[in-house]
Amino acid sequence: MASAAAAAATARGPRYAPPDPTLPKPWRGLIDGNTGYLYFWNPETKAVQYDRPTAPPPSSPPAQQPPERPRNSDPAESQAQAGASRTQNAAPADDRARNDHLNDHFERRTEAAGSHAQNVPFTEQNTRSNPSSQPCSAAGVYPAQNVFSEAASGDRTSPEAYRAKHEITIVGNEAPAPFMTFQSTGFPPEILREVQQAGFSAPTPIQAQSWPIALRNRDIVAVAKTGSGKTLGYLIPGFILLKRLQHNSRDGPTVLVLSPTRELATQIQDEAKKFGRSSRISSVCLYGGAPKGPQLRDLERGADIVVATPGRLNDILEMRRVSLHQVSYLVLDEADRMLDMGFEPQIRKIVKQVQPKRQTLMFTATWPKEVRKIASDLLSNPVQVNIGNTDQLVANKSITQYVDVITPPEKSRRLDQILRSQEPGSKIIIFCSTKRMCDQLARNLARQYGASAIHGDKSQAERDSVLSEFRSGRCPILVATDVAARGLDIKDIRVVVNYDFPTGVEDYVHRIGRTGRAGATGVAYTFFCDQDSKYASDLVKILEGANQSVSQQLRDMVSRGGYGGRSRRWASSDDSYGGRGYDSGYTSRSTDNYNSGYGSQSGNGSSFHSSFHNSNSGNQFGDTSGFQTSFHNSSSNNQTSDNPSFHASSNNDQPGDGLSFHARFYSSSRGSDQSRTNNAGFRDRSRSPPSNRNHEDPGSKAVGVSNW
């Protein structure tokens, strides 16, 4: 009986790989008997690593050796000593018990394997492949710092120098050094293979610093701009946890990722499938706007990972069709956006159904007080990783930004110039403020350039079809509302055009962030009109912060009184842009001169026109005596938001001076008595313009859309 157990242990133990004459001496190849992974062992230095060793150049000085340990020809004993060394190195207090457990495990396996196992080292990957040997927690087994040294991987940059170079700051105790190369991560070979086949040569800064923290079972708050590689920053540690725990996926997911929009959710799902395929990790995506039936069937088959929007997940939880009792790894992606959209109650309701002993990772592009509050409530002693300056909104410096100060009738001609200047087939996103304008532009551009529209009124099937054609290049121009500003992760977008300026510089930064992703460069064009002047000051700060040139026209607009209300965007719910609050959506404001982007505005007749032209949306009420009612969609009318938690984000019911209203708003003409248009083309309209407004000659094309 004892001999049979010893034989079984020997069969499962590591063994020498076939001789490889290309390996530099004295390195030897070894094969893990449990997983079949190939790794390498140096009998002289006792180093163990997964990356293939290379002979050091003759002129290079020898790498600094770790403190001298007694040499022992017994690799198994040296491995136990290495395990003890790992326990003494940089492990936080709550992790030391786990390291002691691993060291005991090494010794037990060495004794059970007999004399054969004493001839080859036992790596940490053996414990990762055997879930029963691990403590029952959500921790991932993290590679020790001395197993994959930076010297072995060819990068001798110090952690401090790497952090300074990439503007990484850490808030919290005992944060491990970043993984500056993929070889230093110790990830399983199949995961490394998927990452390298995807074309990544090195971890992004957020990945480099968040991976070692996540693998130590620490909660994380990661503050980084969009396009920084955060998706893999939380997915890969989740994969490693799944491989270790090996829960029954039919009993519920182990990893839960919450996302603000269905576009972002589906893209996270695509990444999970792509990089988890070789590890046989299953995932399901739950989002609104699509039938529940197929999603419920996918859940019944079992899913290791669930990626969900808060609203749809709450619906399914109320149906009792999914259980979260197994979730031990929770991710809140774009947490600031979820709070901005009013999802905080749904998030808290979901978290109540997740076990308290979990690991929570929060990724956000900004760090306002609302995000700080929910982080303090949901996370336990987190390590905060900041990439860049978190005290102010900054744009990606890889994006070249051009701001054209123009009038609304000039937009169409300028857009045509931009599109003609691009290489054929270049992927371009054009952002508009209204759904109707999206459809209008897409129809006008479709024949010559190939364009499609995406916004909240599109069905999920239509959205999927449009995004599929855009990704494939069959339809290289995408016209979108802000629903696509966050969530779209298409790495080869060349140009972003802000046809209409958004309702705040934070949305501007997220819009242009669709280009210049994953280390690439991009170009952003923005049309900036008089009614956008209230954002001029903040826009100049964004441009200067990204080392972009600022036109004299834009500076003149600032000097004439264009302002952004606050030098920083971290405003409370009663004094941020347009009364916008993270928890309460959009508030109602009452003022004579309307200078904010949202709200219900009440003023007197004398200020009606000036206030109207200083806004993009709102309910405008002038002196109703003798007024007629007109409804228009030139800026934004009757626009419901793309998420159910929003109040109507751009909703205009305009009682005003019916005689001069058309001329006051985006006025231009093709015929002197034409005031109604067909929505199938660009709007042509005419009224007698006031003398103090600038107009194009008759026959010029305007861009507003009428909605009678």
UniProtKB/Swiss-Prot annotation:
Start-end of Polar residues biased regions: 75-88, 116-136, 623-654, 666-680
Pfam family of the protein (one): Helicase_C
Residues covered by the WW domain: 21-55
Intracellular or extracellular location(s): Nucleus
Ranges of residues in domain Helicase ATP-binding: 211-385
Entry keyword set: ATP-binding, Helicase, Hydrolase, Nonsense-mediated mRNA decay, Nucleotide-binding, Nucleus, Ribosome biogenesis, RNA-binding, rRNA processing
Motif (Q motif) on chain: 180-208
CDD domains: SF2_C_DEAD, WW
Residues reported to bind ATP: 224-231
Alphabetized SUPFAM superfamilies for the sequence: P-loop containing nucleoside triphosphate hydrolases (SSF52540), WW domain (SSF51045)
MF GO annotations: ATP binding; ATP hydrolysis activity; mRNA binding; RNA helicase activity
Catalytic activity: ATP + H2O = ADP + phosphate + H(+)
Region named Disordered: 1-29, 48-138, 560-708
Comp. bias (Low complexity): 1-11, 583-622
Enzyme Commission number(s) from the entry: 3.6.4.13
Motif annotated as DEAD box, chain positions: 333-336
Entry's family note: Belongs to the DEAD box helicase family. DDX5/DBP2 subfamily.
Domain comment in the entry: The Q motif is unique to and characteristic of the DEAD box family of RNA helicases and controls ATP binding and hydrolysis.
Reported function: ATP-dependent RNA helicase involved nonsense-mediated mRNA decay and ribosome biogenesis through rRNA processing.
Protein name, entry field: DEAD-box ATP-dependent RNA helicase 14
Organism: Oryza sativa subsp. japonica (Rice)
